[in-house]
């Protein structure tokens, strides 16, 4: 084959016959040939590389989301770099100048960079930012969670995960605020009692925070709530442990539901009912929006905000 055809085959172009592409790739593998990404970038102006920008990968939520984005990037015959915004110094970092675009989550220090590069934000609730956004189904999912508890007969429902900082009242609303508001509205719409000062239960968004909250809720083997909606699965897993430590039965005394759909929820005792975010859909939508901007650099697009879907997975923690 010609050098042009070989190059197209290695780049996965669909106009090359599949059998030709396979022959070229087999030959390249046998010869130990590796694509020079820097050279390709110089010739085409594209590196076929995406930067995933996050403040950190601690916790299963961020690592799972990063894996889903990586899978979608790979499907598009591209590569992904992971950059931690906590180490960000300026916008001349190699990963940004080398990458075609950025997908960012929880990276407030990088806002100026995102404005100057093709970018998509995940879980962004600052409507003043002119950037495409893909969010979790915080509103619809929270309403579904409360409706599920009510359908299971719960009449005194607490919401666990209020980590609001009174010393920082100007913080941009995030998924926490959306989930708390939607849950409260659904409880009140059902004619059930709810007092913000009493029924928004403080907890950091972690298993340890949930354990501490569970200990605080359990009094001599009893809990004043018969249903608890935890704003993420980490909190819910901690709640299960904290309540169990103090002799409160789930679901016998209180039913518990989480949010996210992380894998650990399948293995807790009892197994955790959860609102599972469509992480794959989140990643696919983000890549679709990003590629539209990368492939049309000279075009102007109004920023879009997309909320992905969810699935309520019923398990033992809310069993009838």
Language-model features: locations:
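Short beta-strand segments enriched in small/hydrophobic residues
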Residues: 5-8, 43-57, 156-169
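Periplasmic-binding protein-like
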Residues: 51, 98-105, 158-161, 222-232, ...
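N-terminal helix-turn-helix DNA-binding module of bacterial transcription factors
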Residues: 1-48
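Flexible loop/turn connectors
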Residues: 215-320
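Hinge/beta->alpha junction and helix N-cap segments in small-molecule ligand-binding domains
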Residues: 19, 55-64, 84-90, 134-143, ...
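Non-catalytic positions within long, well-ordered alpha-helices that form the structural scaffold/packing
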Residues: 94-95, 150-153, 218
């Amino acid at each position: 084959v010609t050098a042009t055809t070989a190059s197209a085959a290695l780049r996965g172009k669909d106009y090359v016959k599949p059998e030709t592409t396979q022959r070229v790739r087999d030959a390249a593998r046998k010869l130990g040939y590796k694509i020079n990404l820097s050279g390709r970038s110089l010739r085409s102006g594209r590196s076929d590389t995406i930067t995933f920008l996050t403040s950190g990968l601690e916790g299963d939520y961020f690592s799972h989301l990063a894996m889903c984005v990586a899978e979608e990037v790979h499907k598009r015959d591209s590569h992904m770099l992971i950059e931690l915004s906590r180490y960000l110094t300026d916008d001349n970092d190699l990963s940004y100048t080398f990458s075609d675009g950025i997908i960012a989550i929880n990276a407030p220090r990088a806002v100026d960079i995102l404005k100057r590069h093709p970018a998509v934000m995940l879980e962004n609730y600052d409507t003043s930012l002119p950037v495409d956004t893909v969010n979790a189904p915080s509103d619809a999912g929270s309403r579904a969670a409360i409706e599920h508890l009510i359908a299971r007969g719960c009449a005194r429902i607490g919401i666990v995960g209020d980590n609001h900082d009174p010393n920082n009242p100007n913080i941009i609303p995030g998924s926490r605020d959306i989930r708390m508001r939607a849950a409260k509205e659904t409880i009140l719409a059902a004619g059930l009692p709810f007092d913000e000062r009493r029924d928004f239960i403080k907890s950091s968004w972690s298993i340890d925070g949930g354990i501490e909250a569970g200990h605080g809720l359990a009094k001599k083997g009893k809990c004043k709530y018969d249903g608890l909606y935890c704003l993420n699965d980490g909190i819910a897993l901690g709640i299960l442990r904290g309540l169990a430590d103090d002799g409160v039965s789930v679901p016998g005394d209180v039913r518990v539901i989480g949010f996210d759909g992380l894998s650990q929820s399948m293995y807790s005792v009892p197994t955790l009912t959860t609102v599972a975010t469509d992480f794959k859909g989140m990643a696919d939508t983000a890549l679709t929006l990003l590629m539209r901007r990368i492939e049309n650099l000279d075009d102007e697009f109004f920023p879009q905000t997309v909320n992905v879907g969810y699935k309520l997975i019923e398990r033992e923690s809310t069993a009838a």
